[in-house]
Design a protein with these regions (language model features):
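Conserved acetyl-CoA-binding loop-helix of GNAT-fold acetyltransferases
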Residues: 87-90, 96-109, 233-245
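Amide-forming acyltransferase catalytic core, primarily the GNAT-like/NAT-type
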Residues: 138-246, 256-258, 288-305
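Short amphipathic alpha-helix that is part of the acyltransferase structural core
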Residues: 1-70, 77-80, 84, 148-188, ...
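Conserved GNAT acetyl-CoA-binding A-motif
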Residues: 104, 110-122, 247-258
Length: 378
């Protein structure tokens, strides 16, 4: 019997939850409840989010599932169109039948022209087979009570939005969220459920005058803040000190480099930091991704050298040329006859453009363009 691949509907919700819960419970050796862990996606009224999953069916039975959420990621005045893959599961009896390959083919065929980039979290060796490579950079910044001991103490109030009513504050929370330099476009009613994903605690922050001054999404198991927004990022030292005083432990914060002023400030008040790849990426639209990322770097780092660079790769339909002037960046594909400055094969292209530990490939000032910032806050 052939395997049927199609997008799910709300009628498939219970079957999807059953497959995900059983597959991940067995893999993680603990009970997993996707409805509670991912309320934005699997709550009883989240019909549109169920429909952003591809399912594999054999004899009418769901045997495989993979998410493909189409999202807009705003970075300054630019927008990256992204496809968030995840919730990938294949029933044990169906493994080895090409189910995962068929689902990824369906996702690629239906989303590649709609999205600049796709990403997921998982084992590099497994997902490289489908065009995903580990790259990009996230800063895991560690804060300690000792490091902030000289910071003035302010008594902030931290309210768990799972157990306290927050609807009256939704507009203020959204205003803080959308004032950030980079953020995923979300509907108002999706913000708090999104901050609750993966079992995290969505916390609303009030200052001493009981006015909202920010929010955090806190992972209590790993003692880390996975997402945050403050009205004034220069209050971060006081907010973090107050929060660590409340929970009586040191914490880490995950940050990107799109907003360099924020990143530099957090590093300056931190104990230490490490840099790692945030995800595995499959780039569908090299022109737009490179243009947005290099434009961002140009805006964040003054006096980045100007010039042009033509790159050839077996992963590209033809060579592409990057041109950077003082305030503008352009990226376009060129004919194969174009003389290229550098040729990169396979995933070396990703490491060249977005690799953390990147060697100097070019040997002149254009090396300062790279690595380009690439990050996903999800």
């Amino acid at each position: 019997m052939s395997i049927d691949i199609r997008w799910l509907t709300y009628d498939d919700r219970n079957f999807a939850l059953s497959l995900l819960n059983s597959t991940f419970s067995a893999a993680n050796e603990r009970f997993e409840d996707f409805q509670n862990t991912f309320p934005r996606i699997f709550s009883a009224n989240a019909e549109k989010n169920i429909s952003q999953h591809v399912g594999a069916f054999e004899n009418g039975k769901l045997i495989g599932i993979s998410a493909a959420y189409i999202l807009n990621y705003h970075i300054g005045n630019d927008t990256l169109r992204i496809c968030a893959n995840g919730n990938i599961a294949v029933s044990r009896s169906a493994r080895g039948k090409g189910v995962m390959s068929a689902m990824f083919e369906k996702i690629a065929n239906d989303t590649s022209d709609k999205c600049d980039i796709s990403y997921l979290h998982g084992k590099k060796a497994r997902y490289r087979l489908f065009g995903y490579e580990e790259c990009g950079a996230q800063y895991n910044i560690s804060f300690t009570r000792h490091m902030l001991k000289d910071t003035a103490f302010v008594q902030y109030t931290f309210s768990d939005m799972r157990s306290n009513s927050y609807e009256q504050y939704t507009d203020e929370l959204m205003a803080i969220y959308e004032s950030k330099f980079d953020y995923i476009e979300r509907a108002k009613d999706e913000l708090v459920p999104a901050l609750t994903s993966c079992g995290r605690i969505p916390i609303c922050i009030f200052d001493e005058q009981r006015k909202i001054c920010g929010y955090i999404s806190y992972d209590s198991q790993n003692e880390s803040i996975e997402e945050f927004g403050f009205k004034n990022y220069l209050d971060a030292d006081k907010i973090l000190k107050s929060f660590m005083n409340l929970i009586q432990t040191d914490i880490s914060v995950r940050v990107c480099e799109y907003d360099k002023a924020l990143l530099d400030y957090l590093i300056d008040i931190s104990e230490s930091y490490t840099v790692s790849a945030p995800a595995l990426f499959k780039i569908n639209n090299f022109e737009n991704v490179i243009r947005i990322c290099l434009k961002n770097k140009t805006e964040q780092i003054k006096n980045l050298p100007c010039g042009s660079l033509c790159i050839k790769s077996d992963m590209l339909k033809s060579p592409f040329k990057i041109e950077k002037n003082k305030d503008t960046v352009s990226v376009e594909f060129k004919p194969d006859t174009e003389k290229c400055d550098i040729e990169l094969n396979g995933y070396e292209l990703h490491r060249f453009l977005f690799g953390i530990h990147r060697q100097k490939y070019i040997g002149d000032e254009r090396d300062l363009w790279f690595p380009l910032p690439l990050y996903i806050p999800y």
